[in-house]
Amino acid sequence: MMMNRCEGQTRRTQGTQRSIVVGLCLGVLCVLCVERAAGAQEPAAPQTVSPAQLQAAIAKLGDLDYATRTNASRMVRRTASAQAVPVLMQAVSEQADGYVRYRALVLLTGFNDPRTKDAMRESLASPNDRLRTVAYSFFEHNPDRAMVAQFMSSLDKEQAEFVRPALVRALASVAAGAQGDDVGRARQALVREVSRGEDFFRSAVIEALGDYKAQYAFDALTAVAKLDGPLQDDAALALGKIGDKRALDTLAAIQRTAPRPAQPAIATAICLLDVNCESHQSYLVDTLKFSDKNPGFQELLRAAAAGLGALAVAGHAEAAQALVDLGVPSKDPTRAPMSLALATVALRNTPLTMAMLEKHPGRENAIVLLAEGFDMLEEDLDKERFFAFTRRTYWESPDNLPRRALMQTLIGKLDF
């Protein structure tokens, strides 16, 4: 959805067509400009800017130049809420550029303003896939039982590749609430989706059910886990996340027969059930080391990195530490899956990530690894939530605390 850092670097080095020398000079100046802005001292509080400056920044949110759009987002994020929110809401409704509307909607979520919910409800009906994805992601993090009927209606017709998984997660989030007729219908719909449709969408359903500890889907997930196929590892991991130890018999059985690429997910699931966790985590670490030294095991590598990521999200700090320890000195193709897993941990268990980085002796290199993972993630709303948390923590922390220095470093390295 967003350009990755490599694309951004390419954009930053593009100059005019007049000469290679001029192009290179302009590229260097752009890089220096972005690095200087990112590395500058963060303001101690939200700022007030002129209305013209704010409007100009919003208009540049979709600029092709990396430095321009990054600095525009940076200005909007640091503007006082009372000034920024009305202008962002206007942009979401009225901007002619669909990508600018999308970026404005994402930035709006960082201000924690109650009016954001109205903008999200309206965006659910937008023909713009990006806006609908952001809106469903918002309701995942802000579940509203009043939206269940609308979500279920959308479930029967929404087929956009990035939108449907966000819709499923929003429905799974509200289904995790207290039982009631609306929640019951949502749960029935999600269980039905486990065995219906394309594998890509079924995988998203299975993951969401695991993430939201959907005990009600235990039997459906167990049935999928027992079948050889592309969804076996997804279902096994979901059972581990749910935490019902009845799953142990199934997991132990498929551990003996499942193909090698599925083994990391099964080991992770058993660890999540608090059974032989140390040995299973060691297996994941050893698998990463093996895959690093022996090319050709990329699928196994991705599975092991994702397994450590899942353990870290569940609160296993040593798993996050292993991703950093192995990831920092590594090179691609080993490095990318570990940086992606670390970034996922940062989004889904931000307190654990912050605590680890705050006391890590190699913080700078760990944050570089994290930044690479952020560039690969497409969850722009979740990243914005992380950015907002980081800024608030910076503003609220006393000058002399290590946490404030960490926030400053994150803001600079992650270009926000």
Language-model features: locations:
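Short N-terminal segments immediately surrounding and downstream of signal-peptide cleavage
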Residues: 42-64
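Intrinsically disordered, low-complexity regions enriched in polar/acidic and amide residues
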Residues: 8, 13-16, 40, 46, ...
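Structural detector for internal amphipathic alpha-helices that build alpha-solenoid repeat scaffolds
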Residues: 41-48, 67-81, 90, 99-113, ...
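Alpha-solenoid HEAT/Armadillo-like helical repeat scaffolds in large eukaryotic proteins
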Residues: 56-60, 64, 87-95, 119-127, ...
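Intrinsic disorder/low-complexity segments
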Residues: 1-39, 44
